């Protein structure tokens, strides 16, 4: 897998204005997420208001779901709502494996077909920056499938600095333990095994409050 390739995705942006305060999304990156396969893909919005456009099936909802996965608690995730899809049409597992079609097995039952098997990892990463505070915050999630397991596991990270997939999430070998060990040496980088403490950490870092209302509003807006 050549994860060093870094492929830009297009998003129309407007010029920044003084009204754009607080932490703004600067860059969003994905690796092995849905049909964004085998290399790093990124959106560089640089804190501006942006409009994501593309043909049907080009991956717009896949990217939106990736950003939602970084910010919304697992129990509240409703993938592909931005495209008006039915519940359970997509899942964390389907994005991890890159399911893109289905085919019938020998018994006539439809089975999903994916771009990837079990021996890989997926990464979601978002960089935020506050011009007023001159501070950066990065959120990341790493997904992998342990041997002999069917459920995807996740590592959650909050860092008070700009991170990138190419610089911080590649070249650590074939064990997630190697990545965890490397990231422990990164200043201002916290690791979590579950979503609740991760959410508490990034809400504090981004100034979102502790009641979860800002994230609930974000999730409702995405679903409209």
Language-model regions: role of each:
Residues 1-192, 207, 211-213:
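Extreme N-terminal "head/tail" segments of very large remodeling/mechanoenzyme assemblies
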Residues 199:
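Conserved P-loop NTPase mechanochemical-coupling segment
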Residues 208-224:
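Extended heptad-repeat soluble alpha-helical coiled-coil rod/stalk domains used for dimerization
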């Amino acid at each position: 897998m050549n994860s060093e390739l870094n492929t830009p995705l297009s998003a129309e942006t407007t010029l920044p204005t003084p009204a754009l305060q607080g932490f703004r999304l600067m860059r969003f990156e994905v690796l092995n997420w849905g049909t964004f396969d085998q290399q790093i893909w990124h959106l560089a919005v640089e804190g501006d208001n942006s409009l994501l456009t593309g043909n049907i099936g080009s991956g717009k909802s896949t990217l939106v779901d990736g950003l939602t996965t970084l910010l919304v608690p697992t129990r509240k995730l409703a993938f592909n709502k931005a495209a008006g899809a039915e519940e359970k049409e997509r899942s964390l597992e389907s994005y991890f494996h890159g399911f893109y079609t289905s085919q019938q097995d020998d018994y006539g039952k439809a089975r999903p077909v994916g771009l990837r098997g079990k021996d890989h990892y997926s990464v979601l990463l978002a960089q935020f920056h506050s011009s007023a505070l001159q501070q950066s915050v990065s959120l990341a999630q790493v997904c992998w499938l342990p041997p002999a397991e069917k459920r995807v596991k996740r590592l959650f990270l909050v860092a008070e600095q700009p991170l990138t997939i190419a610089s911080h999430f590649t070249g650590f070998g074939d064990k997630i333990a190697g990545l965890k060990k490397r990231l422990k040496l990164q200043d201002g980088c916290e690791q979590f095994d579950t979503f609740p403490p991760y959410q508490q950490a990034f809400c504090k870092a981004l100034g979102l409050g502790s009641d979860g209302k800002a994230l609930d509003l974000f999730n409702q807006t995405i679903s409209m």
